[in-house]
A protein has these predicted regions:
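Glycine-rich phosphate-binding loops that contact phosphosugars or nucleotide phosphates
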Residues: 29, 36-182, 211, 258-304, ...
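Active-site phosphate/pyrophosphate-binding segments
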Residues: 2-44, 135-254, 264, 331-348
Length: 348
């Protein structure tokens, strides 16, 4: 098997998550004490690329566990249209692997000037973002050399759990401490996933579906297929997919689905039933206890750990990351250096 940097960094995730949890739990506790005196009525998240997918997860997690409304910022409203958004009383959270995203940092700077409480989530402690934000949570992933972000994405997700905890959300730190071991279990599926990827060597298009807390993973998996494998990959909520896009599906059309246990299963299962009737080729990522999936999916990637739905997003993205890395190798592509891409992208 070709050993890309991307695959190396995927394998580093359990230790990176353990470092992040051990170090940033203290910062989260400190922020928890601070925010008790200044509880925000609104949270605004700003990010680009993979970090934007992490922010989408943050929106679901924060609203579900804290009840505080969350908005995803559209940077062009300020950077291009020059609107002066009133951030007074809000918590504005900027998410950036490098901490050097121009538009993300500009929004954070404006927000702080206009009365917002600001927090940065980044992998770089010496970055512009870390200097601009009043409070910082650091991804302790170490240097990420592959252009395709993997270990920093899961680190960002973990920090959103810590942020939810700090804001009084229904999050138990003891539960979070189980996530790295669940990721180790997912990594043990590498040979199985490498063999599976061979079947899709000539895949040119695909759809990825998820819902709820794993909806962001559908975006992230699709992004990895696009940037490392050059597959045209669309991503949808399992509910939204039925409102038009399902017309794309014909026999053998490839669909990848995140199918965790919990409140989203009925919706996802219903969508898979419909896809099965259309003879789609369905690959589902699910848990070891879901026996209903066998009748719905063409192939199933089963994680080794049975987790509550709220804890599934980090371990569930790992098989998808490995699949993209393995498929890129099967296609003769270098996932570490996708054409026309750089590690840090500057936009306004």
């Amino acid at each position: 098997m070709f050993m890309s940097r991307m695959l190396e960094e995927i394998r580093q995730q359990p230790e990176a998550l353990e470092r992040t949890f051990a170090s940033e739990m203290r910062r989260a506790e400190k922020f928890k004490r601070f925010v008790e005196k200044r509880r925000p009525k609104l949270i605004v998240l700003v990010a680009r690329g993979t970090s934007d997918n992490a922010a989408l997860f943050g929106r679901y997690l924060l609203e579900i566990t804290t009840g505080i409304p969350v908005s995803l910022a559209a940077p062009s409203i300020e950077t291009l249209y020059k609107a002066r958004v009133n951030y007074s009383g809000a918590l504005v959270v900027a998410v950036s692997q490098s901490g050097e995203s121009t538009d993300t940092n500009l929004i954070l700077e404006h927000a702080r000037e206009r009365g917002a409480l600001t927090l940065g989530i980044t992998n770089e402690s010496g970055s512009s973002l870390a200097r601009l934000a009043e409070h910082v949570l650091l991804v302790r992933a170490g240097k990420e050399r592959s252009v395709a972000a993997t270990k920093t994405y899961t680190g960002q997700l973990l920090l959103f759990y810590l942020l939810a905890y700090a804001l009084g959300g229904r999050i138990r730190p003891d539960d979070l401490a189980r996530i790295p071991e669940a990721v180790r279990g997912a990594l043990a599926l590498e040979d199985e996933i490498d063999a599976l990827s061979e079947r899709y060597r000539f895949m040119r298009y695909a759809v990825v579906v998820g819902r709820g807390l794993n909806y962001s993973n559908a975006f992230e998996f699709a992004l990895k297929l696009m940037e490392t494998c050059y597959v045209v990959a669309e991503r949808f909520s399992s509910a939204d997919f039925l409102h038009g896009p399902i017309a794309l599906v014909e026999p053998s059309f490839p669909v990848f689905a995140f199918a965790p246990p919990g409140v989203t299963w009925e919706s996802i299962g219903g969508t898979l039933d419909k896809l099965r009737s259309l003879k789609a080729e369905i690959v589902a990522i699910s848990d070891p206890g879901n026996r209903e999936i066998e009748a719905r999916a063409t192939r199933t990637i089963r994680l080794k750990s049975k987790l509550k739905e709220v804890l599934t997003p980090i371990p569930y993205i790992v098989p998808a990351q490995m699949f993209a890395a393995c498929l890129a190798a099967k296609k003769g592509l270098d996932p570490d250096q996708p054409r026309t891409l750089k590690k840090v992208t500057l936009t306004l």
